[in-house]
């Protein structure tokens, strides 16, 4: 049951992240705030499900452990898709799903699409923030590397939240989601 409910929650996270990215692409940050808050709550629900299993003693757990197999939640195609949508990209992770053509196709599409973070950087560039052009045209299937210019942009947003309220709030929402994901 745990696995099935987790997969349902992850399916909802994927849907919500796609919706949020659409709003960010359309420069409607405010519309994405509630969605990202919902994602944070879904993530919390996913994590809190494990509290029930924590009540089991080792001897109770051993009684049914054999039926769980050797799989890991990290092998879930939906989990990996969420990772890619959030920007944690690694092409090598496709290999885990090579046996499943549908999962591989969905994951490849997510890997090669801009992440939530990519869309936010593009939004900031459209607003005139100094996002380096090479970040906007980079291969989005690769993981991000730290960039001093982007750090300066975020520093400016945080030093003047009243002037850049929606960008500031989006930064906070992304941190909230990332903290729940990590």
Which residues does each predicted region cover?
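Surface-exposed peri-terminal alpha-helical interaction modules
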Residues: 1-182
